[in-house]
Structures are given as C-alpha cells and as structure tokens.
Amino acid sequence: MVDSSRDSCFKAGKFSAPGFRFHPTDEELVVYYLKRKICCKKLRVNAIGVVDVYKVDPSELPGLSMLKTGDRQWFFFTPRNRKYPNAARSSRGTATGYWKATGKDRVIEYNSRSVGLKKTLVFYRGRAPNGERTDWVMHEYTMDEEELGRCKNAKEYYALYKLYKKSGAGPKNGEQYGAPFQEEEWVDSDSEDADSVAVPDYPVVRYENGPCVDDTKFCNPVKLQLEDIEKLLNEIPDAPGVNQRQFDEFVGVPQGNSAEVIQSTLLNNSSGEYIDPRTNGMFLPNGQLYNRDSSFQSHLNSFEATSGMAPLLDNEKEEYIEMNDLLIPELGASSTEKSTEFLNHGEFGDVNEYDQLFNDISVFQGTSTDLSCLSNFTNNTSGQRQQLLYEQFQYQTPENQLNNYMHPSTTLNQFTDNMWFKDDQAALYVQPPQSSSGAFTSQSTGVMPESMNPTMSVNPQYKEGQNGGGTRSQFSSALWELLESIPSTPASACEGPLNQTFVRMSSFSRIRFNGTSVTSRKVTVAKKRISNRGFLLLSIMGALCAIFWVFKATVGVMGRPLLS
C-alpha cells in the first residue's frame, strides 16, 4: 500500500518534485527492504510490490510495478518456489522463455558480516538450451541463512528482484536508468496548495517587552525590517573598539621599545646604579700590580661603589684557593677597584661610561677628545677585543698561568700583534708624564688586566717583585725556594715541551704538538745504533754462508773433494 499522507513526498507511485528517485543500494535492499519484508515488519514507503516474476513475461513486469515515476528500473518481491521439493534451487522457467544466471555471484556484506547474495540473470526466449538472448536483465537478492535466522517472525521466504532493460547487446557500465525529464508533467497549478509550506516574510531575530508569567518573561517576537539591518551594518565601522585584557602578572614588564627604556633595563639596576660584574684590577706586563697615579685617581672619584656586588665577589673568592693565590704576589686592598656608577648618568647624552672615562683622561692631560669618536671606537672594539682578552686570561689553566708568569714574552707578543696595540691610535693608552721608560720593554706577557678598561699606565714607584711594601709573602717565598731546590733541568722547569704542547689560536682551537724530552732522544739514538750494529753483523754472516754454499755446489759438480 502506498503511503498517501499529506506529509509524504511519495504519492500514488510518484514523487512530489522532480529529481527524487527510488535508488537504494544493495545493502539497503537486503538489510532494510528484504529483511523487513521477511520479518513481517512495516515499510515506511511501499515502493516494492509482490509479483511472481517467473510467471510473467519481462515486457509486462513494468506495468505491475508500484513505482510510476517513469524510471526504467523496477523492483519486486517474489516468493521463492523450489525446482525440486528437497532442494534450494529455484525454478526460473517462464511461459515464453527462461532466466539464466550469468557472471559471478556477489556477497553482500554489512558491518563485516555476510547478509545476502546477489545474482545476475538474463532472459532467453524459447526453450533451453537453444533460447535467444534478450536485453532484459534482472538482479536477484537473497538473504543469507544466518541473517535469516535473526528474524523471529519469519513466515514466508522472499527474494527481491531489480529489473531493467539494456539499450543494446554487450556490457553497459554506467548507463543511467532514470526517467527522462518532461516539463509538462510539473506545470504548477494555482489551485493545488496541498504541499505548500508557509514561510514567514521576515526573520524572527529578537524579543522585547513581553508579558510576564510567574516572574518569567514571555517574549513576543518582533519583526526586523530591512531598514533596521542596513542601519546596524552602517553602525559597525563607528562602533567603539574592544579593550585589551590586562594581566596582573605582566604589570612589571616595560611596555615600549624606546631607547630610554632599553638603556634603563640594560645599564641600571633597581636603584639606578650601574653594575659591572668584572673587577677593575690591572697588572703590569711583568705580573706586578699596577696602581694608578693619585692625580689620575682623583678623576675617578665621580664613581661610587655599589653596595652589594663587591662583598659578593669577595665571598666567592674566599671560598676557593686558586693557583694565582700561590704563584702571584699577594694583592693589597687597593689592587681591586669596586664597581662604580655615574653620579650624573646621561650627562653627556648618548656617550657611554667608557667615553666619560676617556674624557676624564683627556682633561687630566690637558688635551681635547672627541666624545663621538670615542663612542664609536669603544662600541666597535670594546665588546669584541676586550671580551677576548678577558676570556683568554680568566680561562687559562693554572699551569699555563705559571708559565706565562715566568716567561710572559709569548703572550705579550700575541697581545701586541693580534689585538689593537698595532693601531695608530695607540696614543689612547694614557701614560703619566713620569712613567717608566722600560715598563713595556720587558717581553712579559701572561698576566692580562682583569678589568675590561683599555686605559693602562705605569707608575714608576712599582718595580718587579714589589707589592705594597715591596716584599713578597712568606708563603710564596718559601714555595719558590722549594721549587728551586728540586733537581731538574731548566727545560723541564719552565720551557719544557709541556708548556708548548697546546698553542692557543685566534679561533679558540688548539694545535697539538708531540713533545719529547732530550733524555728520551739520547736513549732512542743509542738503541738505534745497537740495532744497526746487530743488523750489520747479521748481514755479514749471511754473506759468508752464501759464499760457502756456492763453493760447495761448485765442488759437487766437478766431482772432487774441496781439500784435495
């Protein structure tokens, strides 16, 4: 029975609009239509009628279909009749011919289980086996035995058939069997409004001023006109912007990238003081402590020591004993300057602390200095060259520092050749008028200045071997006497191959040389001479044996004894 309710789109075997077709898949035909038919369940759309296809000629079957859509394929339920009483094979003979199975059977699966079987049948006119093949094709869908066992109310066994006619002989893959469109069948009638659906003229978007029922507002819809929509769209560009959210945990982060903010962040601490983590102690090339002249020291009184950095550095030094404490003369309290700050920070504009220091030097000497040139010079050279000097001195092993202290000529040459001592601007190294003429003539290196300040000068009151009062510490003197009492060659003491094993390069790499001692060389030469003598003696013995065997062979050929 065809569903003819008002809400159904399928009426009297036709669909209410073009484009709707009954085109189920193989799984839908077996699992829904065939299974529900066998289980005596109701179908939502009765598009398949019950017809015995084996008792009717194929040309008459389209008129018996419940589908009147004009499609060129039809569906039928047929009770299965057996050819033999005790066999499952069906009888496919008709009054005008017979249906013959062709091709391979296809198993229909659903949820990874077999639910049915599909066969392809072709109609032949006449009696078997001399029938004439026609273009009528039918697909037979049968349910699997296990799936059939799931039906509890099964009373009769059906098979589902899909019938269509090909356009000609041979396979017709992809051929469409839908009904051809005819415009005359879908002419609208003003009197027919059965399936019309009422659509509101205006969309319902908001509610206001509705009556209240039990403290709950019951809102009535308000229609939004087209003019209101245009007004809302025009007000969007003038709408106020959305305020950005502020997070409390990021309040202290400086907002902005101005030069003042960056300078304050990098150069100033919370109290406005400039903190230099490196100490400013300086040493002469011969390893002695250098103390600036009192007149020069007076120009540095514009700096103030930070309150917390110097004690921290002193505590760190007291916790460890380094090789420098044993080999280098003890440093006085005045040897290490404290980190300083400018009283009037920013007095010279963009000139940094090194420019102000060079300006103080020029004032002390009575000369003028261009602060802009000094700023460019320090910015280009201070960060690179001074960092290299500082790391080369700070990260030396205690043994290398000892060798550099005893024979500092190599380090000074490297310092003067590779760094900016060769520059024509060497006059920037300010020396007091009474500086010693032989201060830098000594080929002494090895002890680099601890501070990164390039300004170096010599005070004549300090000479080699003096510190404060001009005397060495008792512990250092005793240690040197102990080292001098060790019986060893000078090469192993200060200029041995161990000192020249690692040569520091500009790229911070190391070239390794194999060093051998003089004693080992003498032993090796003596062993070579003994081995050469043994080899010569062995060669002479071999030659004598060869001559003997040659004479013996000659006598044997001649047939007479050797001594006769």
From Swiss-Prot:
Gene3D superfamilies: NAC domain. The chain crosses the membrane at residues 535-555. Expressed in roots, rosette leaves, shoot apex, stems and flowers. It holds the Pfam family NAM. Keywords: Activator, DNA-binding, Membrane, Nucleus, Stress response, Transcription, Transcription regulation, Transmembrane, Transmembrane helix. PROSITE patterns: NAC (PS51005). GO terms for biological process: positive regulation of DNA-templated transcription; positive regulation of leaf senescence. Disruption phenotype: Stay-green phenotype during senescence, salt stress and oxidative stress. Its main location: membrane. Residues 115-172 bind DNA. GO terms for molecular function: DNA-binding transcription factor activity; transcription cis-regulatory region binding. Residues 16-166 form the NAC domain. It is a single-pass membrane protein. The keyword Ubl conjugation does not apply. It is found in: Membrane; Nucleus. GO terms for cellular component: membrane; nucleus. It comes from the Eukaryota. Induction: By cold, salt, drought stress and methyl methanesulfonate (MMS) treatment. The NAC domain includes a DNA binding domain and a dimerization domain. Transcriptional activator activated by proteolytic cleavage through regulated intramembrane proteolysis (RIP). Transcriptional activator that promotes leaf senescence by up-regulating senescence-associated genes in response to developmental and stress-induced senescence signals. Functions in salt and oxidative stress-responsive signaling pathways. Binds to the promoter of NAC029/NAP and NAC059/ORS1 genes. This is NAC domain-containing protein 16. The gene is NAC016.
